[in-house]
């Protein structure tokens, strides 16, 4: 029986989980509990590594391909770079929002910290050619995530913990910018 489960495609596995959760009762409760366990297993450094990897994988040629004239007007290389970075970060920003929607405030904060750390590492460690075209984009994106997080109504303890994380562990070079701009305190 375990072999059957391991052979399911991701779509088939999702279908099984959905059918089980529709059964209700103890089965649904078990599925929901396990889903929360999976979502609670956040590794801040793993998230940071994933963010760094997706940003560091952007090819400068993709930026050049997007830049230039089109039916919709002209796109500068800088605008194309912003679009590319935002596209890569969108799934991470969306996941942070899902944590909020589920009422998982601690997980949301930890996840945001991992994303911010990954963005910071990208700005300071990446050797990619694209990074040269992405000047100021990382700090702006991290600031946008912090603003979104803050606007979702964080308490003062969470805000203080986020500020401490940014100042002491993550990105001391960015702290002045974030806190001068009113983020996230």
Residue ranges and their predicted role:
Residues 2-3, 22, 26-185:
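Eukaryote-biased, non-catalytic alpha-solenoid scaffold regions
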Residues 1-19, 32:
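Eukaryotic low-complexity, mixed-charge intrinsically disordered interaction/regulatory segments enriched
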């Amino acid at each position: 029986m375990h072999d059957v489960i391991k052979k399911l495609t991701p779509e088939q596995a999702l279908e099984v989980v959905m059918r089980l959760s529709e059964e209700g009762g103890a089965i649904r409760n078990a599925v929901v509990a396990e889903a929360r366990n999976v979502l609670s297993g956040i590794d801040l450094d793993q998230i940071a590594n994933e963010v760094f990897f997706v940003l560091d994988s952007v090819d400068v040629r993709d930026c050049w391909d997007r830049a230039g004239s089109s039916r919709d007007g002209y796109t500068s290389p800088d605008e194309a770079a912003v679009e590319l970075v935002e596209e890569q970060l969108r799934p991470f920003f969306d996941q942070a929002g899902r944590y909020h929607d589920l009422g998982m405030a601690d997980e949301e904060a930890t996840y945001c910290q991992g994303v911010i750390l990954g963005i910071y590492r990208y700005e300071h460690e990446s050797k990619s050619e694209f990074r040269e075209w992405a000047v100021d984009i990382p700090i702006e994106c991290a600031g946008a995530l912090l603003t979104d997080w803050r606007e979702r109504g964080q308490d003062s303890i969470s805000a203080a913990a986020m500020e401490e994380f940014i100042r002491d562990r993550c990105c001391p070079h960015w702290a002045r910018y974030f806190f001068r701009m009113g983020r996230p305190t």
